[in-house]
Design a protein with these regions (language model features):
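Generic signature of intrinsically disordered, low-complexity, basic-rich segments
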Residues: 7-9, 174
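Juxtamembrane interface at the cytosolic side of transmembrane helices
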Residues: 367-378
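C-terminal motif of bacterial Sec signal peptides marking the signal peptidase cleavage site
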Residues: 16-19
């Protein structure tokens, strides 16, 4: 069987081998004092996306945009945005300018939309991503006379994660270890030497790899049961076969698999477990299994490809950026899809707007009070 494209992508994402932000793709969120907001997403587009008319729905790496999103494009590093659609002539011209690179890597598509409130905005993001994903957001205003605090919170999460990973992650690593591997927090390597850090990471990587193998094996094993009536002289009944799934999934043989680069590995494990080759024909069509696995992991592939920098602009001055970093008037959050695996991803930002009018009113009240005091003393 040829190495499955989706499995390579998924494996790389899970093992954090390719989970770096290219620095160009981002999601800019602007919160206004009146509660209205806007969101702009910038990403490298495929030709059919950037060449589509503004009233035509588009899909780009699993992101879905309708006609209610304003669209434009720009060359990477250039602040000038151009209207869509980009023409074939423009695409060819850009290819001549960048002969050794793909045009897609040298341009960005920008999609922007305004919202009445942050709830509407988060619902829209859920619709854009769609695949096993949900966003929720809230904005609270706290009036304190001389100033008003704005507290913005947003949570990004994977929904129904068991659709992809049916075997619980906590059977392989602790909650803190999983969080450290996928998000970097808590820092379990704090105080360790370089050699000790490598030993720790090697152990975690082996356990995460085992978990992924187990989840994939569980899916393949269960999916094969749908064709159980094709098995000639099975060593056990279908009910017994399914009941023994956990024993297969958690076996040492699964731990050492090469992430299903060859479906015959699955067949061999099952054959060795049951001491029978009755199930071997179920795995004879490698191309069919490639299609099955491709479909299984497509939604997850899209999630793992998400790695935009999250930028937030709040009203007034930011006084608490949470886990973000303040750069000028922008709060930046580092984000990538695999960070959603152990737990939801939280954004929490508090900003403060000075109420100038409150100072003026207070000053006038003081002046009136002092004036009244001296007036009545006369």
């Amino acid at each position: 069987m040829k190495t499955n494209r989706i499995l390579i992508i998924v494996a790389a994402a899970v093992l954090l081998l390719t989970s770096c932000n290219n620095g160009h793709e981002r999601m800019l969120t602007i919160i206004n004092e009146d509660g209205t907001c806007s969101r702009e997403m910038s990403f490298h587009p495929y030709p059919n996306s950037v060449m589509a008319s503004s009233d035509e729905p588009i899909e780009n790496d699993g992101l879905h945009f309708g006609a209610d999103w304003q669209r434009s494009w720009s060359v990477v590093g250039d602040s000038v945005c151009h209207p869509i659609p980009l023409t074939q002539e423009q695409w060819d011209s850009l290819q001549r300018v960048f002969p050794k690179q793909t045009v897609r890597d040298k341009i960005l598509m920008h999609t922007k939309r305004n919202f009445q409130n942050v709830s509407e905005m988060s619902d829209s993001l859920t619709s854009v991503v769609r695949h096993l994903f949900k966003a929720t957001a809230s904005l609270d205003k706290h009036f304190k006379w001389f100033y008003t605090d704005y507290v913005y919170q947003e949570t990004l999460a994977i929904t129904d994660i068991e659709q992809i990973f049916s075997v619980p992650l906590d059977r392989f690593v602790s909650a803190d270890t999983a969080s450290y591997w996928f998000t970097g927090q808590p820092n379990l390597a704090d105080g360790l030497t370089g050699a000790e850090q490598k030993e720790l990471l090697d152990e975690i990587e082996a356990n995460i790899s085992h978990w992924f193998n187990a989840c994939t094996m569980a899916f393949v094993y269960t999916y094969a049961s749908l064709r159980y009536d094709e098995v000639k002289n099975p060593p056990v009944s279908k009910e017994q076969y399914l009941a023994l799934k956990d024993s297969i999934v958690m076996s040492p043989a699964v731990r050492n698999m090469d992430l299903f680069s060859d479906i015959s590995q699955v067949s061999k494990i099952i054959k060795d477990f049951y001491h029978s080759d009755a199930y071997t024909p179920l795995f004879s069509d490698s191309k069919e299994w490639e299609r099955v696995l491709d479909k299984k992991y497509k939604s997850y592939e899209y999630l793992m490809m998400m790695a935009p920098q999250l930028d937030y602009v709040m009203p007034g001055k930011v006084i608490d950026a949470g886990n973000g970093v303040v750069e000028g008037n922008v709060v930046r959050y580092r984000f990538s899809g695999e960070r959603l695996i152990p737990h939801p991803y939280d954004v929490a930002i508090t900003s403060r707007v000075t109420n100038v009018w409150a100072f003026i009113v207070t000053f006038l009240v003081i002046i009136l009070a002092v004036g009244s005091f001296f007036y009545y003393r006369k």
